[in-house]
Every structure is written in structure tokens, then in C-alpha cells.
Amino acid sequence: MGRSSRREFLRQVGHAGLALGLGSKLGALTGCDSVNSASGRYDVIIVGGGTAGVIVAAKLLAASGGRKRILIIEAGGKTAASIGGTDLPPWLPPGAAGLALFDVPGQYSTVPFTPLGAPYQLTETPFTYQGIGLGGNSQFNGMLFQTNPPLVFNRSWPEGWGWTDMAPYFKRIRQNMPVTNTPSADGIPQNTGPADIVHPLYESMGWVETDTSRPFPEQGVFSRPYVAAEDGMRAGPVSGYFEEVDPGGVPVEGLEILEFTKADLIEFDDNGRAAAVHYTKRGALDQKLPGEPGSAKLKKDGLLVMAAGGLVTPRLLLLSGVGPKGREGEIFPGQTPVPFAIENQHVGVGLFDHVLTMVTFGYDGPVPYQAYNYADYEGNEADLQEYLATRSGPYAQYQPVSILNLRRGSDVPNVEVFVNPNGAGTPGGPFYGPDTLSAFIMLLNPKSRGLVTLDENGNVRFPSIYMPPDTPEGQEDIELMTQATFDILQLFKEDPGLGIVFGPGSQSFPDLDPDNIEDVRTYVTSPSPVDGVFYSRLTVNHWGGTARLTDGPGGVDPETLILRGTGNVAVVDASLIPTVVPAHPVGTIMAVADRAGDILAAKWD
């Protein structure tokens, strides 16, 4: 059975109360709809049905054969059509079925920071776009797959988490989730103009075109991006793991899902064991709706699994009295917090993210090229019809459309350049014409770290980790970003068809000289936005490190994944990653979650 027909079958059998077997352990389990409130006591409560949460849920269900009660508390609801998602692309014809907004690779760039995606933006992280819904950010992002370098695992992760330990899990992910650089169902690369323009420049530097989804020894490599897709549709944790335990949006026996529900507080007993999770459940996706309070209780030997992501997992722990004693004033600035009841010096500490600088170019050279606006449904009608008919064409293509990874004075990749087939700002505006493309320079191994801090409403505050000028680490990041951006500007200058439209020397920054490295430094450190365009110190949503694996004291126990200071709280998401991943991290997050499922399930053996 092909994967697309298999997805349709899952939708059908889900409503018939059946399920396929994940590893043949879930066959013939009857299902029930998502629940309106928690009842009784649970063997496992998973806070967050995102990238890691859905993988761990599927693994634990397979291990238990449906004999354990597992509850997912998720702030959003259904996403992909294969798990009952009904939020449709705005261009889908009436009566069409089998395709949700999140299934279309090209659609993802029209969701964050737009009216279309506003209901899915988590309100507790107001400075950025964190998507809510089953599958989490893996349903909202570009699913660009890269591998954490083996050297990083061997040098910076605890014993037992080296490359030989993790390589089988990367292999397993790719078995469950196809990775390709031609996501269009017809196998034809889409929106190739930017790659056709810049890849010859990369070749001139001696950099190598190769499979950038796998570890590489070269100093510089480039490719069309390798992404998670199959038959022209988004692939990921939902398609690779979760749709088998939630077919058609009907959870199999043993799984319950509290949708539109936010965890407010973890209740601990006197021994540091989580006893319950107090939550607020809304009646729909709208986060402004009032909710009903409730509590989900654990069995005496139950397990609480934190899978809400690198920002929200530490947020809930901190609000629940778990954190670094003595730093309450830093974490709750301007407030009068009570001392943390459970000591763990690594909760909320060591936050990292990648950081971006953007430059937009115009092109008038010999390579055929036209910018592509995925939100122009009227202008793209023929492409939409092609996608509906064959799952091929531009809407089967994620952004970006070109990737370059470099080692600059480093034994691991520390700079990436990716290119999108469109300009900056409003389509048709001064920086987004028919011949524009945008290059993003990203630090893959930034040195700056920070704290998760909360405002008086309990929301996560903007972290000062994006090249802060007042720290040695920030200065080191500024130096690398300056040099990397300067070098790319000089390289792109070698193609006479490329000219800067937004960036130093353009109408947006006429007083800055792109050939002067100090002016480039001014550009990469100047405040955004300018002329309505955000271009410097950009967040990337690759957070982690906020409840990291350590050999102690504090942090998470590498052997059990239990958060030290607690008796039964496990962490399985990006929070436990001990150091920045010098790659797009979704593959690493998935590999960690797959292994976490094995570690946690072993307690039932």
C-alpha cells in the first residue's frame, strides 16, 4: 500500500474505530474520541503533543499494547488531515477532501505571522511564532533535515549519547519519514532559480554539492534542501509515528487527548513526585476563549513527560516551583517570587537558538528566474490545480530552495546560508519585486546563552541571546556574523546580475558600504525593523538547552531522562539537548524523542 493511500486508509479506519499496528503491537485496538476532561488516574501524562510528544506517545502506546492509560495535554488541536485536521487551505475547492492546511509544503510560509496562522500562535511566547496543535512546530516549519555532527555527540553529550548510540535512531527516523531534495511528487525540482544562480558561485570557492542531510567532512557543502516529504505532502512525526495511533483523529485504546488545553501547574507531593497536572481547557482553538479548569492525576507509579518545547517546558517547571534556587529574581524580574521548592540549577538556564541576518537581492542575469509568492492564489491558480491533481509543482516545495553549510575556523559547521525565492516585506513593495531573492546568513554554533524569564502574566520574555554586545560570547557571535555576511556579499558580487535591494548600499541603507566590513558590522547589529522589514538578530525557533542532559548535579539524568530533584518527571524535547545543534535541529529532536520512547518504555519491561 502506498503512503498516500495508506494515509487515506488511516482516515477511514479511524472513524471505524480501528488502528493499524505500530510494530504490530497496536492492531485491532478500538478507539475513542478526544476527551473533554481528565478522569481517573493515568500511567503517563504527556504535556505537549508537539514534535517530541507525539513520537513518545506513539512509542509508549506500542510498548504497552494499549494496556496503559496515556494522556496528552495539547494547547492546540488536530492538524494534518490524516489525524482529523479540518483547517483547509483557502484555495481548496468546495467538496475537496483529504488535504489540510498543514499538509501542503508550500503553504507553510504563508502561516507564521499572518492572519491565516494567527490562531495557532502560542500566546505564552508572544515575541515569536510557536505553533500549537498535534505535531507542534513540525507542522508549521520547513522540515529541513540535517544531522547533528557526530563530533558534537561524542564531545558535548553525556556518556551513552554518543554518535554510535544515536546513529540507529537517525536511521529509524528516515525509515519512518522520507527525506528528499525533490519533494514534488513528479520528482522535478521546483523554484530552482536561486540555486541555479548561486550554486556556481559556491562551486567557484571549491565547495562541494552533496547530500546536506547527512554528516559531511568538507569545509563547505551545498545543495537543494533535503526535507521531510512524501508524494508531494509534508512528512514528519505525525505521518511517521502518530497517525497510526490517532487515525482520522480517533485515538486508539489507551490514548486520550485533551485538545485546546494548556497545562497551568504541576502538583508535587512532599517527595518531589508529580501527582497531578492542573490545566485550563478551552472549547475551541481560539486562545482568547475562557476555559474550564481541571486536573489530570497520575497513578502512584505514574510518569509525567515534559514535551512542550525548549521554551514552554521550562516555563511550566519554573511556574510549578522547580528551578535554580537563588535565581528567582532573575527569572521573575520585577516581581516577588517565592523560592523554588525543588532545586535544579539547569531548569531555564542555558537557553540557545540560532540567529539570522537577511540581505535581499535583485537579479537581472541570464538564468531564468521569477520570485514566487505562495500567498498569490489567484496568480498561482495553474500551480494550485497542478498540485491538487498530481501533488506536484511549486506548492510541493518548501522554502528555502538553496542551502550552504560552512566550517569557518571550526571543526563543526558554524555558518549556513539559505536562499528563499522571494523578496522582503510586502509583495510588490520596494524590496519584493518579480526578480528578488533573499539570502539568510545563520550562525549554526552561536556562543551566546541565556535564561528563560517570565513576565507578571507568566509569559516567556524575549531572551537576550541574539548577538548581545555586552558579553564576550555576544561579541564573538557578532564577529563571525560580520565576517560571514561580508564574505557572502563579496561572493555574490562576482555575479554581475545580482544587486543588493535590501541591505548595505541599497535604498534601505544608502550610507553603508557593502565593501566596508565595519559598515557590514553596523548592518548586522542595527535594530530591526527598517522600512517594515526585519533583517537583523532574527530568531530562528531552534531553542533548546533549558533542562539539559548532564552528569549532575541538576539537569536531566541521561540514563533515565528523569529531571533531577523530581521522582517521576521526564524530559524528552529540545530542552534536554545539552548544547546547540550546529544544524537544523528537527532531525535531532526526533531522534532524541524516538530514543526517549525506548528509555521510558523500558520501565515497563
Region roles according to the model:
Residues 581-595:
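A conserved FAD-binding loop/helix module that cradles the flavin
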Residues 55, 59-70, 76-88, 266, ...:
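Glycine-rich loop(s) and the adjacent beta-strand/alpha-helix scaffold that form part
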Residues 85, 90-207, 368, 439-466, ...:
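Redox-cofactor-proximal catalytic regions of oxidoreductases
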Residues 159, 358-484, 536-545, 571-574, ...:
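FAD cofactor-binding and catalytic pocket of flavoenzymes
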Residues 39-50:
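Beta1/beta-strand and adjacent pyrophosphate-binding region of the FAD-binding site
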Residues 264-265, 498-580:
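A glycine-rich dinucleotide-binding beta-alpha-beta segment and adjacent secondary-structure elements
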Residues 139, 152-269, 274, 508-509, ...:
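Conserved redox-cofactor binding core of oxidoreductases
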Residues 2, 8-30:
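N-terminal export signals
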